[in-house]
């Protein structure tokens, strides 16, 4: 199950699909307020978004999933594993964090969104999501990402950005029982290496992988390396479950 970042949609996972579909059933979804999912009244909470994911898992009838989330998706994954541990077989937390350092930055972004719309956030978002060399040399991809950002409903952004701003779950991380890997781009300014190290240190048994020359959307900047990490981890966990005679969707 793949969970998207703020200001994106399920299409952000396209680089990972060929490899994953060769071995697994893959469920991508648009988080509340994004893509084709319903936009409800803001604000939202990360717990609410995790409950959305749990409801989707129940609806599909798969029982439990190997969950991978990037940025906001990883924040949702943490809460999902805490609130609904029976629905999580393994957890891949990518370019994410357990809390954000200050609400002021998010309040500024929310003000910009209200005054200028999503278009007022695009340039700053691109700078945070990708290293300069990637922006300079990957015009087609950057244009696709720009279009994706611009499709984000304003109220959906406000709802989810408020959830990210208000998130505080570091103190809950030791409750996570699912096997966990943490993946981060070394140059990520949005959810930093230091924030990933908090996840590594606080989640029992978590393993950290750092991708060089990548920023926030490491799955797009370094798709081969990112996908291999994801594929290998899920494969290992699925094999372990199979050997124990347990379901391994």
State what each model feature region is.
Residues 48-65:
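Conserved acidic catalytic loop of the alpha/beta-hydrolase fold
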Residues 186-191:
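Acidic catalytic loop of the alpha/beta-hydrolase fold
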Residues 101-104, 115-175:
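Conserved alpha/beta-hydrolase catalytic His-Asp/Glu region
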Residues 176, 182-184:
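Short beta-strand/loop motif that positions the catalytic acidic residue
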Residues 30, 66, 89-92:
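Residue in the alpha/beta-hydrolase core beta-strand immediately N-terminal to the catalytic nucleophile
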Residues 206-249:
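Catalytic active-site module of serine/aspartate enzymes centered on a nucleophile-bearing elbow/loop
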Residues 75-83, 87-122:
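Flexible "cap/lid" loop of the alpha/beta hydrolase fold
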Residues 1-42:
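Conserved HGGG/HGGXW glycine-rich cap/lid loop of the alpha/beta-hydrolase fold
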């Amino acid at each position: 199950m793949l969970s998207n970042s703020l200001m994106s949609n399920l299409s952000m996972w396209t680089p990972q699909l060929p490899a994953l579909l060769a071995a697994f059933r893959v469920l991508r979804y648009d988080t509340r307020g994004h893509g084709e999912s319903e936009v409800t009244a803001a604000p939202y909470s990360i717990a609410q978004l995790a409950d959305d994911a749990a409801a989707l898992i129940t609806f599909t009838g798969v029982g439990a999933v190997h969950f991978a989330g990037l940025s906001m998706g990883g924040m949702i994954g943490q809460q999902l594993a805490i609130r609904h541990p029976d629905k999580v077989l393994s957890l891949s937390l990518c370019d994410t964090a357990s809390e954000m350092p200050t609400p002021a930055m998010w309040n500024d972004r929310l003000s910009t969104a209200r005054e200028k719309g999503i278009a007022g956030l695009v340039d700053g978002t691109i700078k945070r999501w990708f290293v300069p060399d990637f922006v300079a040399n990957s015009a087609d991809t950057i244009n696709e990402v720009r279009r994706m950002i611009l499709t984000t409903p304003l109220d959906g952004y406000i709802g989810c950005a408020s959830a990210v701003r208000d998130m505080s779950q570091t103190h809950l991380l030791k409750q996570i029982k699912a096997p966990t890997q943490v993946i981060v781009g070394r140059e990520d300014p949005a959810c930093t290496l230091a924030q990933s190290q908090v996840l590594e240190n606080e989640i029992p048994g978590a393993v950290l992988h750092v991708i060089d020359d990548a920023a926030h959307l490491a799955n797009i900047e370094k798709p081969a390396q990112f996908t291999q990490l994801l594929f290998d981890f899920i494969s290992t966990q699925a094999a372990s479950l199979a050997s124990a005679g347990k379901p391994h969707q």
